[in-house]
Amino acid sequence: EKKPSGTTSFDPLPAAQKIDELLNAHLKSENLKPNPLISDGLFLRRIYLSIIGRIPTILEANNFLNSNSKNKHSELIQKLLSNDAGYTAHHYQFWADLLRIPTNVDYTLYYREWIKSQIRNNTPYDDLVHQLVSGHGLIFDNPAAAYYLRDAGMALDNMSNSVRIFLGTRLECAQCHDHPFDKWTQMDYFKMAAYTYDFDVRMGVAKNSNRQRVYQDFGKRKNAAYKKEAGFEDFPHIHDESKIDEWLGQPYAPGYLERNNLTKEQFREAAVRAIAARKKVEEFDNPVSQSVNMLYGHISNVQVKHHDDKPLKLPHDYQYDNGAPEEIVKPGTMFGPEIPHLEDQTERKNAYANWLTSPENPRFTRVIVNRLWKRAFGHGIFEPVDNLTDRTEINQPALLRFLENLMQELDYDIRDFQNVLFHTELFRREMHLEDHSPGMKFHFAGPLLKRMSAEQIWDSITTLILPNVDTYAPNRKRTQERIARTKAIYQS
């Protein structure tokens, strides 16, 4: 069982000192010197922005700057990591961007609150990812299933995104052909996608449901009123009066008028009557239609399920010798241990999640430590963080190996891992202020200068205005009410 967040039992200093030793040895080998240490004031601002995403209040600043404790830097780090509200709010932005969580649909309310609870409870990273990629069922019962709702109707794209996010590997090109710049083949792509391709999302309700019959009845009523007032069963559909002359200007209009013995003026009068009749029905039905949409809109995305009759097939134009067009693809891993063939979809998905998050997976740990390193210091040990290939040049391999081992020794405890990074001398060094071009080696004499995020700027401004800014959540009650309403609507 994981220790509670904000624990003081973990000593980050030995690992932090080892990181500094590796960095200093590398700098020495390059005839470089580390940047000078920053002042307490700069450290104060940097650590607040890094851990809880805002500047300190005047009281918080004075408490730190006036402290005579020899360990005040470490004590402040521990205090901020123990600030569940501030830590969760700031780190949620990181995960929301990474997981591409939308904010404009109701189903994500459950998902967003669940992600925040995982951050707050310090769920191990491997456990969090396992829950996400193995998730299925109703989001009320298993909010992690909403990870697949993000790519509703795009099962192939979901696999590309998962591999990029969690393994730092770009497979998009291999969806259509063998990757031109990496070793992945189109068959590799489809074998990976076969693990999760059979998932689907319950988008609303069935075609023969009461809801659909209501919409069908609305449509029939409008069409009947339109045709009755026009006086012709085959009277053309014209949306509004401004389109009448446009229709009369079409090459097929004279033939229609002649067949029905109509002049242009008679046609125009019939169209005006028909449009008015349809609008009258719409005015009566629209409030009901809107009420139905309001009711069902809340539950249009609430479930991830498996299909028994949805095997993944190669494209109709598959051109390589290792398969035939429209051949059914069996799942297979792109690297690392093979997964035994499993017929049961849930077991197969769990086995895929086990493979993805395994310490034996050569990229799972490497990618997350590099992402967190870049978040702390402005530049990854390798770049880009989500385009790792066999040809990727890693400037400090010993440092990367140490960080991977550290993450595994910490059982993927994200707070403890960041605790180590924030205790390094590197974190307290002056930033690298010069332009750094992509592709150039970065030696970490100090962190790379980076701009504040929009959220950091906003939260820093509100810090100057609001008391208890970390716990200020005026919309929380409304959010919880919306969640409860959505669940009640579905269960009804």
Regions found by a protein language model. Give the residues of each.
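Extended acidic/polar, glycine-enriched regions
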Residues: 1-5
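Primarily short, surface-exposed interaction patches in extracytoplasmic proteins
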Residues: 11-45, 50-51, 55-86, 100-491
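Conserved AdoMet
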Residues: 89-93
